[in-house]
A protein has these predicted regions:
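Hydrophobic helix-and-loop "lid/oligomerization" segment in the mid-to-C-terminal part
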Residues: 1-107, 112-148
Length: 148
């Protein structure tokens, strides 16, 4: 693909700069992600993002969602989610490095791809149910694949 791109006259450095530039608010929010995520059980992590958090950092739910893959590099993590308070519901962005999670998302009014899905829960208590289900799913995946 890169060999095809170099046939065109464009400034690669300028393109990369534009792709990598984020606002200071979003940069500070990403630091918040690393500071505030929580490990639920072995192999499962999550982050609850309240309206107050978004207001504090000046970000919206769309910007928040851009950070969901930041937790991917955490050693021993197999599935994780961001739970974003949208007032009358909580949107959950679910990601996985192995366990199929779209069936989990479907159980909670969502869907998506096997390793990247979204769901909606009514409140934080229902998020706990989703996290319990996610932990069971990861546990099964680890046993089936003989991962310790």
């Amino acid at each position: 693909m890169a060999s095809e791109l170099i046939k065109y006259d464009f400034n690669m450095s300028e393109l990369l700069d534009k792709m990598e530039i984020i606002s200071e608010n979003l940069m500070r929010f990403r630091a918040f992600i690393f500071e505030k995520y929580d490990v639920y059980q072995d192999g499962v992590a999550y982050l609850k993002i309240t309206k107050e958090d978004m207001d504090k950092y000046g970000v919206d739910p769309g910007e928040v969602s851009t950070g969901v893959n930041l937790l991917r590099s955490l050693k021993g993590l197999y599935a994780w989610c961001f739970a974003i308070d949208e007032g009358n519901k909580v949107r959950v962005r679910i990601r996985s490095k192995g366990p199929v999670i779209n069936t989990l998302a479907e159980k909670y009014a969502g869907g998506g791809h096997p390793l990247a899905s979204g769901a909606t829960v009514k409140n934080w208590e229902e998020l706990d149910d989703l996290l319990d289900d996610m932990a069971r799913l990861v546990g099964e995946y680890l046993r089936e694949n003989s991962i310790k």
